[in-house]
Amino acid sequence: MSRVPSIPAAEAWARVQRGEARLLDLRTELERRRYGWPPGAQRVALAQHVVRPGGPDTIYLCQHANRSKLTGRRGASEVRDGWQGWLDAGLPVERT
């Protein structure tokens, strides 16, 4: 498995906003309910994306930037520092 490129949360959000990438949330539904999620981020199962990872337009987000490293093929990238990186960048969060 190749290394997953890690990008700052602000860059990930900018790419999503420009329509250049999609943000996939690898966290569990419990984590999303507890901590919130980025607007428009689709929750996906890790197992599905280890077998068939996304391409260069895919950015993965997980709680601590660990699970996303398992998807590192075909040019997908991850949000550096995971959910904490997202929060530290002051990016939008949705909650129920």
How would you describe each model-predicted region?
Residues 1-22, 29-96:
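Rhodanese-like catalytic fold shared by cysteine-dependent sulfurtransferases
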